[in-house]
């Protein structure tokens, strides 16, 4: 993000952090109760969704 501003922790409740066994992996946006939209570079078979 270029020129972005910090936000409060509850300001964007649809933001998702994806972690793998080594820590933070990628981020995404919660579309509904089942789906998270991420960038294509977040695709990996090295993690399991819970």
From Swiss-Prot:
It is found in: Secreted. N-glycosylated. Residues 1-50 form the Peptidase S1 domain. The active site is at residue 41. One of its GO terms (molecular function) is serine-type endopeptidase activity. Disulfide bonds join 26-42. Optimum pH is 6.0-10.5. Glycans are attached at residue 20. One of its GO terms (cellular component) is extracellular region. SUPFAM superfamilies: Trypsin-like serine proteases (SSF50494). Expressed by the venom gland. Keywords: Blood coagulation cascade activating toxin, Complement system impairing toxin, Disulfide bond, Fibrinolytic toxin, Glycoprotein, Hemostasis impairing toxin, Hydrolase, Platelet aggregation activating toxin, Protease, Secreted, Serine protease, Toxin. It is an enzyme of class 3 (hydrolase). Acidic enzyme (pI is 4.7). Negative results: does not degrade the gamma chain of fibrinogen (FGG). Belongs to the peptidase S1 family. Snake venom subfamily. Monomer. This is Thrombin-like enzyme BpirSP27.
